């Protein structure tokens, strides 16, 4: 995982050779190593959001991390069980909504979300809108932190590899 890529060629008859690794694969290997070295929630977010990797484990990691971050912001505030159950259902929708926004696609409208949760539009605006916005903000921050973290990780790996080669 922390080893630098080593260029090489596979020998063929009559002195010709083909690369073992295609140049594009070779040049992107450091990014792949950087992503795979991240904390699980960062890795899951980047793989799901940017590589379209729909692995169930990534979705579970994103949802669990998102709910933990959201619950921490509630700071022990009392809430009806049914409301909390509906909010749990929204956390994955918030992740999908942020992914859609980042890709320039349509996002959920409040009326649509109220229908999905099974509440009136009035109840949505009074009870759920602020929670929805908080959830979306959590995933937007996750996106920013993940991208920053992978960039830093790659820079550290490249610097280490340059140092190790000298």
Where are these regions (language model features)?
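Short, amphipathic alpha-helical "recognition" segments used to contact nucleic acids or chromatin
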Residues: 48, 55-56, 84-108
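N-terminal interaction/assembly modules
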Residues: 1-78, 106-123, 128-166
């Amino acid at each position: 995982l922390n080893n630098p890529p080593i260029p090489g060629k596979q020998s063929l008859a009559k002195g010709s050779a083909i690369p073992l690794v295609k140049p594009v694969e070779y040049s992107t290997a450091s990014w792949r190593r950087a992503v795979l070295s991240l904390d699980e929630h960062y890795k899951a977010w980047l793989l799901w959001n940017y590589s379209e990797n729909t692995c169930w484990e990534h979705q579970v990691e994103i949802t669990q991390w998102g709910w933990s971050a959201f619950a921490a912001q509630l700071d022990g505030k009392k809430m009806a069980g049914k409301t909390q159950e509906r909010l749990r259902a929204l956390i994955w929708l918030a992740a999908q909504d942020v992914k859609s926004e980042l890709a320039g696609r349509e996002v959920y409208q409040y009326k649509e979300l109220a229908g999905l949760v099974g509440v009136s539009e009035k109840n949505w605006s009074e009870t759920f809108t602020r929670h929805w916005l908080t959830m979306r903000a959590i995933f937007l921050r996750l996106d920013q932190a993940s991208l920053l973290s992978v960039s830093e990780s790659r820079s550290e790996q490249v610097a280490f590899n340059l140092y190790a080669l000298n």
